């Protein structure tokens, strides 16, 4: 009897081990089987999986639920809500969704916690196929859960911040054209997962005439199965980003319109900081901090810790430093002259009082200036909310073909300038003379709107709102410090940025003047902003590490010094980087460009500009 019992126990134990091993092997297998083959040679992602490969669709709530103080051990840094925490009153509340935060704190898997994800070997061909049509690593996105967790990178004070108890409802409008399946659905999923219960009235996916089959019936079927407050509206012809936003906004029923791009991820408690300023004054427009989702690995990181939006006189978006009062209150909204683009919240009532977007603007470009100028000049206020953070994929390249309607961006800029910029438009035309000859279309309705709303002058905007812009981006620019080719004394080679883009490295190459027939980008400028950039482009030499041999990257010029501040020494011929106290160096054999400890005896650190403004450098 005893022997039979032992045999039985042994059999049961063996069976349990077999079941457990089979389960683990199955999970490992399915986590990498993210794509189903569809006839026609394409791959359709399956329904999303979380780190445990068993994720329920995001919950939908019909009314706000009471705040909870339940937290995971991972959230010890978050202050426990209490009736007297942070000077709270009966009129405010803690809007954090602690159960969701607790769930995310323990999530593990590809891309979880916003970590970089690297594809397994053998998928290069499939990766490149998707890269070409998306401008980012869409295959990596397919391996990452739609419900993926993100790091809470807000200022610590945001975790204790309370907001008014009664907040308006929001309609989130997401325009898209041929967006990749998983990035589009992750956008919607992140909004629902990280928004307090009951505040999201609806998510409207505004389809700008996509032609991908999976964005038609498969998308509608998926939404019908997994969501109740997400729906798609479709254009019957290609309208462009601006009119697609308007199409979605016209379907909205929430108190507040929130516009997001179709490859974004809302972060922890992102919504209350956007809604509270509008609840207090419906003519306040609120923008979140925009974080970076890496286009290659989907790693999530901060772009910076705040700056005020602005522009130069070619209407490139620029940034102004925070004011001292803003720096002293790092969790409070601060005024900003210009929004960065398409991520913002605005009262639905106020949006239509302002006439929405100008429907005469084609495709994209200029709409952020048109709306920003209109808000400020017509009695509104615009702020950035540091405690609201949304990640955004900045594509490696634009995958969509030119619509074939000429210089639509220039036309849009002229349209904005003629309606809103008054005499200041001449500064734009001085830099872009051909804009004068572009047909802006009929401006009658827009000029009548400005008159009806009794809007202020652009001079008022420049003096009262963007008052410090002339010191950073003057209408009449001072002379640059140095320009032309930059030749290394040791190697005789020139710095060649090779038309590289943001977050890319560059190197040395034979000087174009020495070898005719070669192509490259060797005309550089040490500008009056004290940055170094390719002539006629707005990407700058950027160093983010003080390590020896640190790389030099190209990054969008921000005019705020820091990583992009450079000084040229006409005696030592050094290109000195003050924030790291290192000098530009190179390897003559590998042609690599990097940073090193400054040494006047090292010839690889000596750089010869083709033209030098000695007077300007003497007054640097």
Feature roles, as predicted:
Residues 265, 269-317, 381, 387:
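Conserved donor NDP-sugar-binding/catalytic core segment of glycosyltransferases
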Residues 257:
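Short aromatic/hydrophobic "clamp" motif used to bind/position activated sugar donors
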Residues 236-252:
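Glycine-rich, basic loop-to-helix element that forms the pyrophosphate-binding segment
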Residues 168-173, 202, 370:
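Cell-envelope/extracellular polymer assembly enzymes that use nucleotide-activated donors
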Residues 242, 316-345:
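A recurrent flexible, glycine/aromatic-enriched loop bordering the glycosyltransferase active site
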């Amino acid at each position: 009897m005893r022997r039979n019992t032992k045999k039985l126990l042994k059999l049961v134990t063996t069976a349990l081990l077999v079941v457990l091993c089979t389960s683990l092997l199955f999970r490992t297998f399915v986590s990498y089987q993210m794509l189903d083959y569809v006839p026609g040679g394409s791959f359709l992602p399956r329904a999303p999986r979380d780190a445990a490969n068993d994720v329920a669709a995001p919950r939908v709530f019909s009314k706000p639920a009471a705040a909870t103080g339940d937290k995971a051990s991972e959230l010890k840094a978050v202050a426990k809500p209490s009736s007297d925490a942070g000077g709270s009153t009966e009129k405010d509340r803690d809007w954090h969704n602690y159960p969701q935060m607790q769930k995310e704190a323990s999530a593990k898997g590809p891309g979880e916690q916003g970590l970089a994800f690297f594809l397994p070997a053998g998928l290069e061909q499939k990766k490149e196929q998707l890269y070409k049509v998306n401008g980012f690593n869409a295959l990596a996105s397919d391996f990452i859960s739609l419900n993926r967790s993100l790091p809470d990178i807000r200022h610590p004070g945001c975790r204790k911040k309370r907001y008014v108890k009664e907040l308006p409802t929001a309609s989130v409008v997401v325009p898209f054209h041929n967006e990749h399946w998983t990035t589009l659905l992750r956008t919607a999923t992140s909004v629902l997962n990280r928004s307090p219960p009951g505040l999201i009235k609806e998510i409207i996916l505004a389809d700008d005439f996509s032609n991908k089959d999976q964005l038609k019936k498969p998308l509608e079927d998926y939404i019908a199965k997994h969501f109740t407050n997400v729906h798609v509206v479709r254009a019957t012809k290609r309208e462009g980003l601006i009119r697609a936003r308007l199409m979605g906004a016209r379907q909205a029923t929430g108190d507040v319109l929130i516009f997001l791009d179709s490859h974004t991820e809302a972060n922890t408690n992102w919504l209350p900081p956007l809604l509270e300023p509008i609840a207090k004054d419906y003519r306040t427009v609120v923008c979140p901090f925009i974080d970076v989702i890496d286009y290659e690995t989907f790693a999530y990181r901060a772009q910076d810790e705040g700056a005020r939006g602005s522009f130069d006189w070619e209407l490139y978006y620029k940034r102004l430093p925070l004011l001292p009062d803003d720096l002293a209150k790092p969790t409070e909204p601060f005024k900003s002259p210009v929004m960065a683009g398409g991520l913002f919240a605005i009262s639905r009532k106020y949006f239509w009082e302002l006439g929405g977007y100008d429907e005469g603007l084609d495709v994209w470009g200029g709409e952020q200036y048109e709306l920003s100028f209109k808000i400020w000049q017509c009695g509104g206020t615009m702020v950035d909310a540091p405690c609201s953070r949304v990640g955004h994929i900045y594509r490696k390249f634009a995958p969509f073909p030119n619509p074939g309607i000429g210089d639509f961006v220039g036309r849009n800029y002229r349209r904005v300038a003629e309606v809103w910029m008054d005499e200041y438009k001449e500064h734009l035309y001085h830099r872009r003379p051909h804009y004068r000859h572009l047909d802006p279309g009929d401006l009658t309705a827009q000029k009548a709107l400005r008159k009806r709303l009794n809007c202020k002058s652009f001079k008022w905007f420049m003096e009262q709102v963007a008052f410090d812009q002339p010191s950073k981006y003057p209408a009449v620019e001072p002379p640059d410090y140095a320009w032309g080719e930059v030749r290394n004394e040791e190697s005789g080679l020139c710095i060649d940025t090779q038309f590289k883009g943001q977050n890319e490295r560059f190197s040395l190459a034979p000087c174009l003047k020495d070898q005719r027939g070669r192509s490259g980008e060797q005309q550089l400028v040490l500008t009056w902003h004290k940055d170094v950039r390719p002539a006629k482009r707005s990407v700058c030499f950027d160093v983010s590490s003080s390590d020896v041999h640190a790389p030099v990257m190209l990054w969008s010029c921000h005019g705020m010094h820091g990583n992009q501040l450079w000084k040229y020494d006409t005696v030592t011929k050094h290109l000195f980087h003050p924030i790291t106290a290192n000098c530009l160096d190179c390897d003559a054999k590998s042609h690599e460009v990097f940073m090193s400890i400054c040494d006047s005896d090292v010839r690889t650190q000596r750089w010869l500009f083709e033209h030098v403004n000695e007077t300007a450098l003497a007054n640097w």
